[in-house]
Curated annotation (Swiss-Prot):
Annotated compartments: Plastid, Chloroplast
UniProt source species: Oltmannsiellopsis viridis
InterPro entries named in the record: Ribosomal_uS7 (IPR000235), Ribosomal_uS7_bac/org-type (IPR005717), Ribosomal_uS7_CS (IPR020606), Ribosomal_uS7_dom (IPR023798), Ribosomal_uS7_dom_sf (IPR036823)
Keyword flag Plastid: yes
Protein name: Small ribosomal subunit protein uS7c
GO biological process, one term: translation
UniProtKB keywords: Chloroplast, Plastid, Ribonucleoprotein, Ribosomal protein, RNA-binding, rRNA-binding
């Protein structure tokens, strides 16, 4: 860790179509090899499918999915006296959102299916309904933190 100064957080501009920072963050995480236009196309098609399937505002569905998948606590490895403990720590809102987005995208990439659009759509709908792989991952992290609650005294 640098001792000089903390780096400034990046300013994320809102998405031009939906005026949402969350959409822009998702597009940046979907993007591979710098192909942002492809990532935008995938995400916008997924948004249209969400609108057709749920008859709701797709941005609200996506926000609900991220809110549901956001962890409250996580565990970090900490060496104390030659042994490593999994120490539970609270998650900051920014990190929680980043983890939720990462887990949703990992879950949709691991999903069986033909197109990324269909997988992304189904994962968003599942996460907004508190089901799916991203929610399982959040619950698993919460269980780990609860199981290691005795080591909370070793906080950083």
């Amino acid at each position: 860790m640098s001792r000089r100064r903390q780096n400034k957080p990046r300013v994320i501009t809102p998405d031009p179509t939906y005026d949402s920072r969350l959409v822009h963050m998702f597009v940046n995480r979907i993007m591979k090899d710098g192909k942002k236009s492809v990532a935008y196309r995938l995400f916008y098609e997924a948004i249209n499918e969400i609108r057709e399937k749920t008859q709701q505002d797709p941005i609200k569905v996506i926000e609900q999915a991220v809110r549901n998948a956001t962890p409250l606590v996580e565990v970090k490895a900490r060496r104390v006296g030659g042994s490593t403990y999994q120490v539970p720590l609270e998650v900051s809102p920014e990190r929680g959102t980043a983890l939720a987005m990462r887990w949703i995208l990992i879950a949709c990439r691991n999903r069986p299916g033909r197109t990324m659009v269909a997988k992304l759509t189904n994962e968003f709908i599942d996460a907004s309904n508190n089901t799916g792989s991203a929610i399982k991952k959040r619950d698993e992290v919460h269980r780990m933190a609860e199981a290691n609650q005795a080591f909370a005294k070793f906080r950083f």
